[in-house]
């Protein structure tokens, strides 16, 4: 085997050496350019060799009058000055601004973006230059622009960014003014979007409110944003996301020292989990009780009135009662009996404590609540939508802008992906140089985009979908699943809302989305669609993901969906049961109240263990 690999390596080296010799022999001819391009398709070669080939091709393109293609190659090489000179001839303000930022000439980039009316990009470049005052001015200009064009969402985001800059400049009055404007715009736009049925759009508005609270260090907008996000998730039936947002809200509230909110949110999450049949209700209710005990302790330490301590302890009693924890209920009543309350109350609490201690002593040991899984505990990543959505609104959707911006991004983009981005951009330039229609790209270019494996390919694919006929739309959607990026669901969603070949392509693409990052979107689509083929495709892909979390969702579908969908979930669990699902299955077998389902889960557990033994 080692000898075979060595032979293949020598053959590949020999092939490349011959290809380089051939390209040099062809000289400054179209065939010569094609030969260098063929070499650039070897995206895994050594950086020094690849850079040499790029320089040869760039020089050749300049001689052929292909300035734009040459500029893209120099951008890949991070040759800022040559790229700028070439982009000045044929490029756009976005091209120039992007290269200036690569060269850390952020002040020049700010001016370029500003002259082009790209105020979001200009403000971001000013931030990178450390010029918070200029960034503040630009963000405020963007607020006025978006208000004038009646785009309250982007105006609200611009105001949020202006507040960030004002905070850096210690301009307290300006922070308060811009945050007040931001809150008004995002609240109103969130309401409007909800009434229009755009729950996802409203959700983004409420995420903005969460950030307002973080900047202002005020709990009110922070809580308003989270509670509205949770409410929308409940309306959409996204039980998994609802629990995740509850947990994240609780953790964030705890960090802010909002103990009463922490206790109440635990209780609310527990009641919700019990209502929808999640087995983690007892975990949240127990945590709620413990949080109320902490509130009671702190009230006592601060010397607050006995009535406040009493209220907290009674809230803990209520939560412990919900999980039938008589021992801890008795302990709470003992503490209540020791408070400085009326003799009548103290006697009653003492009697209750005695009675419950007697009952608890006779009772058999109770199982602890099901452990809350680690994947639910993960803190949700902070989505900087207040920056990203502003920049995205100004970005072009053509290939040179959407994919081309990765070419010179050596800090955030893998080297091979930078090379693939360069090749896609050069192929697009070939199409334009040959007189092709920018809105009608050849199918081969669609294939290249789909095989790019980067979220940046989604935006041009969406543009091609919008501009294409039915055949083009279907091709774009079918190939989009190859991206294996969760962002591709923007296309799949649109295809599923269509008809004919396009909708069929959407369902087919859905069946191909089997990677772990796709799980959240698959769950969302399953919950938001009624069509059997869509739910069937989503559920099949969820099962193929095969993680602990996917297993949890399949069990939830099995419990809560009557008829064919429950049968489908059961079949998929039997087909896909694997080691990664074991912890979820064991947890659910222990807590499952339905005997038949408990036996089914037990059989899956035993089968996985047998497979594990056979593998050893």
Stretches with model-predicted labels:
Residues 107, 383-389, 412-433, 454-465, ...:
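Amphipathic alpha-helical scaffolding segments comprising HEAT/armadillo-like alpha-solenoid repeats
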Residues 43, 277, 324, 340, ...:
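Alpha-solenoid repeat junctions
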